[in-house]
Amino acid sequence: MTRKLTRRHVLAAAAATTTASFVTVARGAPAEAQKITPELIEAAKKEGKASWYTSVDLPVAEKVAKAFEAAYPGISMKVERSGAERIFQRIGQEYQSKIYVCDVVNSSDAAHLIIWKRANMLASFLPEDVAQHFPKEHWDPDGMYASWRLTLSPIAYNTSLVKAEDAPKGFNDLLDPKWVGKIVKAHPGYSGTIMTATQQLARDLGWGYFEKLAKQKIMQVQSAADPPKKLALGERAVMADGGEYVITELKARGEPVEEVYAVEGTPLITGPSAVMARAANPNAARLFYAWSMTAAAQQMNVDVGGMRSAHPMVKERPDRKKLSEVKTLREDAAAVADQADDIKAHYTKLFKV
């Protein structure tokens, strides 16, 4: 049986296996912005492939990969999609076994990038678009990672089952007895989005909120992409959390779903990406990573994937509230990095799953 790795295990394993071959930057020296050059493109095409581990919903990930392949013929992208917490486990296990499959990684749990950076598992590469346009809170000064996507974890409801005037307006409304047996919810042990959201809600509302929610006979699912889909199918009337981008795309297709931005504030989740220090295809990895941060690629994330972007040149979708109009909860990736194992344990104790 494969041993389940905690974040502390990853750091310990990295400390035991780190060598001088890791790509690192001296702390305190800002990384230099890197352009997409003809030389990088040529080197990437010689490698001909790259492996991308991501927690974004598979249909979205495949669209992104195909767009990159169309932009750079001759380079194929292999998409490995799973929940962020599962990706974290997989990379940790591969790392322990000295198997380096992942070239580029994306996680909906920003704390993972902090931990991988601490463990010297990331390569320094700062795309020009990130350095020139992204707010500084959305990229690491050492060039180890940057926010590839932003999303929210709102409440939502099925409009065929719930009238707008009866829908919950905030998280505390979900504790009303009328919602017993009617709520679907994702799991922080699988989803990075939900891990981040759980940390924010536990901090701001207290664990007492989750203790009461656990008594509502919720449908427990894994991925943050699952609650919106269960909602659209009518399997539950309300979702307590989940990926906003999935709700956005379902709604655009005419499914009976509607998001609710909670009066208490809606969890904001950044999804950083990075190039792995041990990437088997380092040039293709850097090219894909740099391309994914361009205004055009970021706009595609929004238009086709329903995500949000930190790139100021990207236009918001007209079919939902602008991010600036949504009251959001404060994200604290460093706190998640330190608290995640305890959060999982506490959540499992409350929800018995």
Provide a role label for each language-model segment.
Residues 1-17:
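N-terminal secretory signal peptides and thylakoid transit peptides that target proteins
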Residues 35-74, 155:
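Short, polar/charged alpha-helical segment
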Residues 53-65, 77-95, 100-228, 232-235:
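Extracytoplasmic ligand-binding site segments that recognize negatively charged/polar headgroups
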Residues 111-115, 237-256:
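A ligand-binding cleft/hinge motif common to bilobed small-molecule-binding domains
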Residues 150-152, 179-189, 211-214, 220-221, 253-277, 292-316:
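Periplasmic-binding protein-like
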Residues 156-161, 198-199, 269-281, 300-301:
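A bilobed periplasmic-binding-protein/Venus flytrap-type ligand-binding module shared by bacterial periplasmic
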Residues 316-353:
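Extracellular/periplasmic bilobal clamshell ligand-binding domains
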